[in-house]
């Protein structure tokens, strides 16, 4: 069974994922996969550079340059997501077990990245905003301000 898990920061996704993992489930953390691909996937970086010239220098993504472009232009962000979501989905497909077993895909863009289609069931983890704020403050060592 493949479970797709999504939800906002501080909702409890990590707790759910830890429970699945302790029961022998495979956890596919799409954020970690994305960051690994930024360091290893030359094809993805090449596609980003082709669409957003000057954002990859010596094989390294220049996050500030790219962020300045995509966060100022919704269409540019959609195009970046198309590139990166495709690469992440490809990697998830490579890591999914060929034999039936419990696996969970943890992805903020579960639906946007078309990963939900790989799942037998999807779960949106939610929590009251007050609880989320308290959890984030405790986790990150920050104040509410």
Q: What is each stretch, according to the model?
A:
Residues 32-101:
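ATP-dependent small-molecule kinase phosphotransfer cores
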Residues 21-30, 42-43:
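Post-Walker A helix-loop "phosphate-sensing" segment adjacent to the P-loop in P-loop NTPases
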Residues 11:
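ATP-binding Walker
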